[in-house]
C-alpha cells in the first residue's frame, strides 16, 4: 500500500511540473517593436495657424530627364498645410517616459523611393538599426547623401534601377538626406530607439498606440517650423487627446 501511494505521489508531481512548464511557455513575449505590450493611446492633430506659404515649383531644368516626368511642375514640400490648417510631414513621437524599456527593430525595411527626381516620402521615421532602402525608380542616376550628426555619414552613387541599403544605429531627429546630383532633392529621416512615432499625413492627425500606462513627453518636429512638446498621463486602455499648433516663423 505504501508503495502504491509513493508511485501515485511521484506521478502527480511529474504531471504538475509538466503542466506548470507549459503555462510558462504560454506567457506573454518580451516587449518588442513587432509586439508592443501596452494598451494606452495618445492621439490628436497638428495644425498650422496663420496663412500657410504657397508651395513653390521646383526648377528641374538642370536635368531634362527629371522635368519630363512631370506633367505639371513638382512642388516643394517644406511646409504643406491644407485650407483648414492640417499640417503634413510632422514627426510626432514619445520624447520621454519609456524608462529603460528596450524594443527590437522591425524586420521589414523602411523605404524611400526616388520618382521624378523627388524623394517619396519627404519625411520618414524608423527605428534604430531598422533597414532603410532607398530605391531609384528614375531613368537617371542619383547620389544619396545622408548627413547626420550622431550617426555615420554616408554618400552612395545610385544608377537607375538600383537601391541603397543602410541603417542608423543611434536615435536622431532628423537626418537630412540629399542628392548630390540634383540639389533640389531633400528628405528627412527621423530615427528612434522605440516604436512610438508617426509622421502626419494630409489630415495632420497622429495616433500613438500600444503605449504602456505612464506619463509621457510627446514632441512634434517640423523641418521649418521647429518643435513643440506636451506632457500627458495615460492609463491602461485609456485614450488621451492632445493637439499641437505651429505658427509661421521668419524663415517659413
Ranges and model annotations:
Residues 1-8:
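Bacterial N-terminal signal peptides that target proteins for export
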Residues 9-17:
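Bacterial N-terminal signal peptides
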Residues 21-252:
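Extracytoplasmic copper-binding redox domains, predominantly the cupredoxin/blue-copper superfamily
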Amino acid at each position: 500500500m505504501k508503495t502504491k501511494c509513493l508511485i501515485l505521489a511521484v506521478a502527480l508531481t511529474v504531471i504538475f511540473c509538466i503542466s506548470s512548464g507549459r503555462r510558462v511557455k504560454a506567457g506573454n513575449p518580451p516587449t518588442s517593436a513587432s509586439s508592443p505590450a501596452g494598451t494606452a493611446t495618445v492621439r490628436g492633430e497638428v495644425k498650422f495657424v496663420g496663412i500657410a506659404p504657397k508651395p513653390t515649383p521646383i526648377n528641374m531644368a538642370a536635368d531634362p530627364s527629371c522635368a519630363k516626368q512631370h506633367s505639371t511642375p513638382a512642388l516643394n514640400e517644406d511646409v504643406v498645410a491644407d485650407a483648414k490648417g492640417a499640417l503634413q510631414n510632422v514627426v510626432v513621437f514619445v520624447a520621454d517616459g519609456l524608462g529603460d524599456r528596450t524594443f527590437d527593430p522591425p524586420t521589414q525595411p523602411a523605404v524611400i523611393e526616388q520618382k521624378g527626381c523627388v524623394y517619396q516620402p519627404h519625411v520618414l521615421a524608423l527605428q534604430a538599426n531598422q533597414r532603410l532602402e532607398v530605391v531609384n525608380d528614375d531613368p537617371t542616376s542619383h547620389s544619396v547623401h545622408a548627413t547626420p550628426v550622431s550617426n555615420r555619414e554616408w554618400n552612395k552613387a545610385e544608377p537607375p534601377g538600383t537601391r541603397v541599403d543602410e541603417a542608423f544605429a543611434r536615435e536622431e531627429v532628423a537626418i537630412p538626406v540629399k542628392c548630390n546630383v540634383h540639389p533640389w532633392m531633400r528628405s528627412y529621416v527621423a530615427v528612434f530607439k522605440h516604436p512610438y512615432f508617426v509622421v502626419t499625413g494630409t489630415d495632420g492627425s497622429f495616433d500613438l498606440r500600444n503605449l504602456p500606462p505612464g506619463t509621457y513627453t510627446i514632441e512634434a518636429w517640423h523641418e521649418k517650423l521647429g518643435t513643440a512638446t506636451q506632457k500627458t498621463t495615460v492609463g491602461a486602455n485609456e485614450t488621451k487627446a492632445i493637439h499641437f499648433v505651429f505658427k509661421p516663423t521668419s524663415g517659413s
